[in-house]
Amino acid sequence: MESVLHCNTKDTLKLLGDDKWEALGDEVIIIPKFTTEQPVDCIRGKFGPFRAHSAAKVPLWAALQMEHLQQCTIELPYWLREEELKKMRDDEKANPNIFVKVPRHYTEIAFALLGLPRVFGGDEKQRSRTVLLLRELIELRRDKIVEGLKSFDSSPTELNVSHMSAA
């Protein structure tokens, strides 16, 4: 039996801001539940071929659609694992004057994945801990932005910000 992936992107662009739209193009790893010899042809490109139970990289939008159709499971990116989030949070705390480098579109990708019931295999406690760590990281970064803006006098001459990425 051949699986068919239907992609509906009709109204997606007008529902999303630029950052979310761009994040949907970032690649994630999936574990397909089907095998196909030919690549799957979608509006934004071809993906595959897929082998059941073998990891494959696809754009986030395709992974979300396939997961919705229960055709795959999405692997959490390494940086969304509890230990890595703790490290990023602790690094952010330890460096009050700089923004620690974080993955591009980390907030958009994280909240897209955290909204899926099967991402943590039904472990709601792990999901809750991950959400808490992510929010702590975001708050630390936003606090740095606010403090930085407060420190400006009335005539700033230069603004140099690195690794701010959606705070």
Regions found by a protein language model. Give the residues of each.
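Phosphate-binding glycine-rich loops and adjacent basic patches that engage nucleotide phosphates
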Residues: E22-I30, C72-I74, E92-P96
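Charge/polar-rich, low-complexity and marginally structured segments
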Residues: E2-K20, L80-A167
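N-terminal, Lys/Arg-enriched amphipathic/low-complexity engagement segments
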Residues: M1-G45
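Compact, well-ordered interaction domains used in eukaryotic information-processing assemblies
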Residues: W21, T35-K87
